[in-house]
């Protein structure tokens, strides 16, 4: 179906403040879920599909920012949007994995199966 984007990898539900910026755009928002390949964000400044953004994610309980140099906006619905990360540097991928692991340990486990 047109309008649907398949997710690559499991996403971790989270609530992390973030800043994003791109050509002519600078905003703040909340990361609602995070995976190695992308994220779902609620932002205060509109973006467009195809736009390239840089992200600064403030990880709860971690003094070090998670910096994503290149993320492509894949969908937009009002103030909500999805981005896919362009992970070219292994250190960025390692840092995202580290953050996801840390956040997963702090979240309560679901009693649901599957």
Predicted features and spans:
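Short coil/turn motifs at beta-sheet boundaries
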Residues: 11, 48-50, 64, 76
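C-terminal output/interaction extensions
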Residues: 80-114
């Amino acid at each position: 179906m047109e309008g649907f984007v398949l997710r690559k990898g499991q996403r971790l539900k989270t609530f992390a403040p973030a800043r994003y910026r791109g050509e002519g755009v600078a905003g703040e928002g909340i990361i609602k879920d995070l995976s190695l390949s992308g994220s779902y964000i609620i932002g205060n400044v509109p973006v467009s599909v195809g736009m390239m953004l840089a992200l600064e994610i403030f990880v709860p309980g971690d003094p070090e920012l998670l910096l994503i140099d290149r993320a492509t906006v894949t969908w937009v619905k009002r103030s909500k949007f999805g981005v896919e990360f362009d992970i070219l540097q292994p250190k960025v991928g390692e840092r995202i994995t580290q953050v996801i692991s840390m956040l997963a340990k702090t979240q309560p486990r679901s009693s649901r199966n599957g």
